[in-house]
Curated annotation (Swiss-Prot):
Belongs to the desulfoferrodoxin family. This is Superoxide reductase. SUPFAM superfamilies: Superoxide reductase-like (SSF49367). Uses electrons from reduced NADP, by way of rubredoxin and an oxidoreductase, to catalyze the reduction of superoxide to hydrogen peroxide. It comes from Thermococcus kodakarensis (strain ATCC BAA-918 / JCM 12380 / KOD1) (Pyrococcus kodakaraensis (strain KOD1)). Its cofactor is Fe cation. Fe cation binds at E14, H16, H41, H47, C102, H105.
């Protein structure tokens, strides 16, 4: 199963774990997802974050909904940063899930509760 290959951890001690930060004003939700907030992640052709996905699973929902995906295509000068900002609207509570993919260390996830 794919779920058995996804790694997680504390983003303060593991540079691959995506960090999820959000602000909510009314029904507008702004979410920033970044990799390497505390410990910078390399961004070279040999070792880089290829993409980040953000998912939202409403409390009453049967399955998560893909909010968006960002691909990072350049790993030379000028360097891209593994960081993305997403906007969506909801009045529901639920879970925000972020996935990131490192070309050497695979899939990483994190989650936060959207109040």
């Amino acid at each position: 199963m794919l779920s058995q290959t996804i790694k997680s951890g504390d983003w303060k001690g593991e540079k691959h774990v995506p960090v999820i930060e959000y602000e909510k004003e009314g029904d507008l939700v702004k979410v920033e997802v970044s990799v390497g907030k505390e410990i910078p992640h390399p961004n070279t052709p040999e070792h880089h974050i290829a993409w980040i996905q953000l998912w939202f699973h409403p409390e009453d929902g049967a399955f998560p909904i893909l909010v968006g995906k960002v691909e990072f295509s350049n790993h030379t000068d000028p360097l891209t940063e593994p960081r993305a900002v997403f906007f969506f609207r909801t009045q529901k509570k639920g879970k925000l899930y972020a996935l990131s993919y490192c070309n050497i260390h695979g899939l990483w996830e994190n989650e936060v509760t959207l109040e």
